[in-house]
Swiss-Prot record:
Modified residues annotated as Phosphoserine in this record: S186
PANTHER family the UniProt entry points to: CELL CYCLE PROGRESSION PROTEIN 1 (PTHR28638:SF2)
Organism: Homo sapiens
Lineage of the organism: Eukaryota, Metazoa, Chordata, Craniata, Vertebrata
Protein name per the record: Cell cycle progression protein 1
Broad class of where this protein is predominantly found: membrane
Biased composition (Basic residues): 175-184, 469-479
Topology versus the membrane: Single-pass type II membrane protein
Length: 757
């Protein structure tokens, strides 16, 4: 179908519309009874059917149902079959007769019968239903609809009808055709025409055949339309699938785009964070580079100044070197002049004297070495004696063990078993003390031997140093004479001679001092060893004598005698010691440039002297003035080191008084003599510090103890209240109670002081 032409045909109600020119032909079935009268019933029925068809077609077009290719072909076949059936139903007698008026160019065809109209309506309804059943509507790409023929309502012609009656409002069921206006014909002429038409009935058959051929064309056209609709539907389904695929693709692309966008945003965030960190790192690097730049600039300036300073110093050194080279050349010239003159007789004599003096010194050294060898042999002899005494002690220990064993096997009911056990314990304690003493003496002998060797080595080093110093002094004198050019060669030799004399004199003095020190030390050592062993023998002899007396029924008073001996031995400061105990425990005394070992001199208290009383000054009876120490601090440290193996600072008065108060409160309920005791104590303190350089602290403690004992209130029935006062004081200041001044010396340990009141 084209835009300019559209043809439609059916058995009843088919309308063929052609826009070729301005003519319109309408064909309707005409009955012989109703040729020219309008049928209002038919027109109303046709209007209702047309309205229903239009509504159904609108709904079908709105629904836009889509048919597959399989349903298209049976729908076409059914439509073709219905058309053929309708053609057969049409009666042969039905002849389309048109009426024409002479006065107008409109030809009116008579409407068909009511039965035919009903059949046509049924066919139209079936076609509409089939179109709805088969969904022959429109696709998404192209829509095809079957349009029902529109009824043209024309006004009923009047007697005076003309061409202007077309605009009348009265509808007519007949179809009209507008033709070219002809001239008006008279009534006679119309009658002639009717006669002529009746004569031309055979020509109607030809028109019928032409109509059937037109109907066939319409059927073919409908088939073409159906096929085109099927193809359009198929093409529409393909397009829909393609569009769905496109939509899916679009959704997938959108999802991918969103994912890419999210990943891009995340990357941008990370890049932003990285950018921040890079920015911070760049700032740090910038600050570091700035600092390095500043340091480099400062170093550069420092190096420049240092370089300039070195240049100046180099120039000065070059000048000094040139001047020294000039002086050296001058000195060489002077030496050559002196060599040419030759050596004088005075120089030869001085050299001979120096050689003799050196030979004498060598002889003295040889004699000193021989004396040293003799002293070493004496030391070895003393060591042997020590070993013998040790063997004796071991033998005594064996005898003691035998005695203890025999006592255990003896009668346990005897009254003297308990006392014998006590004596055995005392003897064992004495033996342990003697062993300690022997070990200490052996260690001390080793110490003196080592000190002797060190003194000898130091003397040798000093001799070599003196020689070197003499050479240096002569060299300096020469340089001085050469530099000033005021001295002469004689002055240089005089300086050398004087320096060598001083060295020899100093060396002699050192050798004498070393000899005296070694002799004195060895003599004191041997005397101390002999006295200790003599004392050991006496004590052991007394012990065994006492043991024999006890066995044969000696009295209890005789048994108490060795205990006093042992107590005197444990506390030798209460007993008048021999001369061998004066110098025990080496100390170091400062002598010029070198420290030399000197024995510390212990001081004792005279047991025969009077005891301290409240009215007596104990400083008169004290022989504690120190000759080997200087100052309060030195004497306090020497006393604490020799007696307690610790180093203690001088004792303060307030601390000592607090200790006595604490002891009194602990042992006594009341003590009313604080003022008297303070007056007695104040005599031994100067500026709040004890006078260690005038009196031993142990003697002072014993004096305080005796002073408290001699008070009238505590002379009788004191129950030994003050017996442990000295131990309490020693424990506070020195960390332990008083012990004999032998045994190996320990490293300095600070005493643990108890908290004062």
């Amino acid at each position: 179908m084209s835009e300019n032409s559209s043809d439609s045909d059916s058995s009843c109600g088919w309308t063929v519309i052609s826009h070729e020119g301005s003519d319109i032909e309408m064909l309707n079935s005409v009955t012989p009874t109703d040729s020219c009268e309008p049928a209002p019933e038919c027109s109303s029925l046709e209007q209702e059917e047309l309205q229903a068809l239009q509504i159904e077609q609108g709904e079908s077009s709105q629904n836009g149902t889509v048919l597959m290719e399989e349903t298209a072909y049976p729908a076409l076949e059914e439509t073709s079959s219905t058309i053929e059936a309708e053609e057969q139903k049409i009666p042969e007698d039905s002849i389309y007769i048109g009426t024409a008026s002479d006065d107008s160019d409109i030809v009116t065809l008579e409407p068909p019968k009511l039965e035919e109209i009903g059949n046509q309506e049924v066919v139209i309804v079936e076609e509409a239903q089939s179109s709805e059943d088969f969904n022959m509507g429109s696709s998404s790409s192209s829509q095809y609809t079957f349009c029902q023929p529109e009824t043209v309502f024309s006004s009923q012609p009047s007697d005076d009808e003309s061409s202007s009656d077309e605009t009348s409002n009265q509808p007519s069921p007949a179809f009209r055709r507008r033709r070219a206006r002809k001239k008006t014909v008279s009534a006679s002429e119309s009658e002639d025409r009717l006669v002529a038409e009746q004569e031309t009935e055979p020509s109607k058959e030809l028109s019928k055949r032409q109509f059937s051929s037109g109907l066939n064309k319409c059927v073919i056209l409908a088939l073409v339309i159906a096929i085109s609709m099927g193809f359009g539907h198929f093409y529409g389904t393909i397009q829909i699938q393609k569009r769905q695929q496109l939509v899916r693709k679009i959704h997938e692309d959108e999802l991918n785009d969103m994912k890419d966008y999210l990943s891009q945003c995340q990357q941008e965030q990370e890049s932003f964070i990285d950018y921040k960190s890079l920015k911070e790192n760049l700032a740090r690097c910038w600050t570091l580079t700035e600092a390095e730049k500043m340091s480099f600039e400062t170093q550069k300036t420092n190096l420049a100044t240092e370089n300039q300073y070195l240049r100046v110093s180099l120039e000065k050194e070059e000048k000094a070197l040139s001047s020294l080279q000039e002086e050296l050349n001058k000195l060489r010239e002077q030496i050559r002049i002196l060599e040419d003159k030759g050596t004088s007789t005075e120089l030869v004599k001085e050299n001979q004297k120096l050689k003799q003096h050196l030979e004498e010194e060598k002889q003295k050294k040889h004699s000193f070495l021989s004396q040293r060898e003799t002293l070493l042999t004496e030391a070895k002899m003393l060591k042997r004696e020590l070993e013998r005494e040790r063997l004796v002690t071991t033998a005594l220990r064996g005898e003691l063990q035998q005695l203890s064993g025999s006592q255990l096997h003896g009668k346990s009911d005897s009254p003297n078993v308990y006392t014998e056990k006590k004596e055995i314990a005392i003897l064992r304690e004495r033996l342990t003390e003697l062993e300690r003493k022997l070990t200490f003496e052996q260690q001390r002998s080793d110490l003196w031997e080592r000190l002797y060797v060190e003194a000898k080595d130091q003397n040798g080093k000093q001799g070599t140093d003196g020689k070197k110093k003499g050479g240096r002094g002569s060299h300096r004198a020469k340089n001085k004479s050469k530099e000033t050019f005021l001295g002469s060669v004689k002055e240089t030799f005089d300086a050398m001679k004087n320096s060598t004399k001083e060295f020899v004199r100093h060396h002699k003095e050192k050798i004498k001092q070393a000899k005296e020190a070694v002799k004195e030390n060895l003599k004191k050592f041997s005397d101390s060893v002999k006295s200790t062993f003599r004392h050991f023998k006496d004590t052991t002899k007394n012990i065994f004598d006492e043991k024999g007396n006890k066995r044969f029924g000696a009295t209890k008073e005789a048994a108490e005698k060795p205990r006093t001996v042992f107590s005197d031995y444990l506390h030798p400061q209460y007993k008048a010691p021999t001369e061998n105990h004066h110098n025990r425990g080496p100390t170091m005394q400062n002598d010029g440039r070198k420290e030399k070992p000197v024995h510390f001199k212990e001081f004792r208290k005279n047991t025969n002297s009077k005891k301290c009383s409240p009215g007596h000054d104990c400083r008169e009876n004290s022989h504690s003035f120190r000759k080997a120490c200087s100052g309060v601090f030195d004497c306090a440290q020497q006393e604490s080191m020799s007696l307690f193996n610790t180093v203690v600072n001088p004792i303060r008065m307030d601390e000592f008084r607090q200790i006595i108060q604490r002891y009194m409160l602990k042992e006594l309920d009341t003590f009313c003599h604080w003022n008297e005791l303070d007056q007695f104590i104040n005599k031994f303190f100067l500026n709040g510090v004890f006078i260690h350089d005038q009196k031993l602290f142990t003697d002072f403690v014993n004096d305080v103890k005796d002073y408290l004992r001699n008070m009238k209130e505590y002379e009788v029935d004191n129950d030994g209240v003050f017996e442990k006062l000295d131990e309490y004081i020693y424990r506070h200041f020195f960390g332990h109670t008083f012990s004999p001044p032998y045994g190996p010396r320990s490293v300095y340990i600070k005493p643990c002081h108890y908290s004062s009141l």
